[in-house]
Amino acid sequence: MYLFSEGRLIGIHSEDSKMSTGFKQVPAFSHPPDSWHTINWSAVDRKVRGLQVRIAKATRDQRWRKVKALQRLLTHSLAARASAVRRVTENRGKKTPGVDGELWSTPQAKWLALGRLKSKGYRPAPLRRVYIPKPDGSRRPLGIPTMRDRAMQALYLLALEPVSETVADRNSYGFRPWRSTADAIEQCFVNLSRKHSAEWVLEGDIKGCFDNISHDWLLANVPMDKQVLKKWLKAGFMESHRLYPTEAGTPQGGIISPVLANLALDGLEKVLESHFGKKNTKASYKTKVNYVRYADDFIITGISKELLENEVLPVVSAFMAERGLTLSASKTVVTHIAEGFDFLGQNLRKYNGKLLIKPSRKNLQRHLKKIKDIVRRNCMSRQDVLIHQLNPVLLGWANYHRHVVAKETFGYRSEEHTSELQSPVTI
């Protein structure tokens, strides 16, 4: 526990007598800070990184008792707590309160928050339920935790991420450091572009992945403090002043939710390899089974439609069932590469033996609609205001698709934008 005297941190007392007895100097700092502004962030980052490297190494060596001890050491350190508070008070959601309406917007509030991040007696508040629009017109529910719960999740994420990164599937690309959708698409190109590459693709669609992951599976398999994890999973949510329980799924809207989902879905690549052979082995050449996943979207290639439907799909379904998940029968389909398929906003299709990747039709239409909505909303605005609204959307879409064959699509997009800007608007 951290000890304060008149707002000044004077020492740390460990609750674990095996790890420490009595008081000791905070190891991350040569001079303990006495305010938020006096924290040495270089020392904080160095301390956190050092412990994370040790956790990753222990995970690689499968020394799980050491992993647990190092995770406890990290989550009880002042450095990790300061890093967690900094993260939740500097990200985009820093001005969005939870059910308690509390924000940590001042240095004093951030400083006092350090003493509140402890597992003993911790009880998370219910999530504040809001809805955000989806491209198809429906709405997706999102839970907003309180600032304290966000910081606690950020704290435990520091200890969990080294484990998740060490055990992650090789071809998992979503919600991971230094990986992106462009990397996932590049791997698809590697798997499908050659003359003798697989020609059949299983497009996987998981029904409500984040909402349906089994709590029992998470509690049994996620390597972190089980009591804290259980409290997050069972916290429930508030909507229209009414409390609703949560019986399945990860705490959506929370910082730790994507990593929990990744941990649940990781392992499928190894299962596929055990059934159909590791990549670049004799067995894999016969089946041509390759796997690429970004968050809950994934594809699996295969040498034939029959292999994917009769052998691969049952393996995937069994893997998902263990985690409380099911595949959508209508959206999980097997497609020939000559017909093409959409993945992460791109369309991948072979034309006369050559694989071309370009923006998908749905993605383009969604983008054009967004531009049209901005123009219509700003029909009476000054030109500079409209430009300020349009530029981030135009540049964002162009940057996302800059790695693919998009010359024709970009030309069509420019024509549509010009037409929209020149057309008269009826008010």
Region locations from a protein language model:
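Non-catalytic, polymerase-adjacent accessory regions of viral genome-replication enzymes
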Residues: 1-111
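Extended, charge-enriched "interface" segments that sit outside catalytic cores
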Residues: 20-21, 123-126
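Amphipathic alpha-helical blocks
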Residues: 105-124
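Conserved polymerase palm-domain catalytic core
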Residues: 116, 120, 135, 170-171, ...
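Short, solvent-exposed helix-loop connector elements
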Residues: 141, 245-250, 372-386, 397-409
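Nucleotide/phosphate-binding loop and acidic/charged catalytic motifs
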Residues: 156
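A conserved non-catalytic segment of reverse transcriptases
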Residues: 323-397
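Single conserved hydrophobic/aromatic residue that forms the stacking wall/gate
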Residues: 415-427
